[in-house]
């Protein structure tokens, strides 16, 4: 059920940054470290490679009963039976995506303002990804979003909000009391030598309320 999705530690992949030989290894280690949700994001991969990667990664997420979200590529999400799709403001409109994937799939939408977040909720998004909260090398064109704006978005929408953008073990503590449901992380997990322990550390920092 979509209402029971755990967004706490949301892994976003990037095969160019991973420290392992395969995406499957990276994803499995991240899940072992506590990642609760996985998004396959491969902006430079060919359609064939993306499709194959999605099949391979889904074998891992299915094994551990962790939802798999596909970034942008609705066709691939449907082809492999992924749990949902995440789209940005420059991708296919979220309302159109919802019509294509139906109501049973998870729909995540990126938003950098209160207005965009409210709009995303109205068209049927299940969660909102807000960022970039910190400087990030994985999305150099991302506009910065302040912690203040993040908290305003949390107050204005009733669906889960996930923080994204440059989140790591040093700054994750700043997000603990913002009201967000989870943190989405790329390089601070997938590019680390010990992916499992890196995920465990981030989870401990974010979840620990001390």
From Swiss-Prot:
Cellular component, GO, one term: cytoplasm
Residues annotated to bind Mg(2+): 72, 91
Signal peptide: none
Annotated protein name in UniProt: Thiamine-phosphate synthase
Biochemical pathway: Cofactor biosynthesis; thiamine diphosphate biosynthesis; thiamine phosphate from 4-amino-2-methyl-5-diphosphomethylpyrimidine and 4-methyl-5-(2-phosphoethyl)-thiazole: step 1/1
Known function: Condenses 4-methyl-5-(beta-hydroxyethyl)thiazole monophosphate (THZ-P) and 2-methyl-4-amino-5-hydroxymethyl pyrimidine pyrophosphate (HMP-PP) to form thiamine monophosphate (TMP).
Cofactor: Mg(2+)
SUPFAM superfamilies on file: Thiamin phosphate synthase
Magnesium is among the record's keywords: yes
Cofactor note: Binds 1 Mg(2+) ion per subunit.
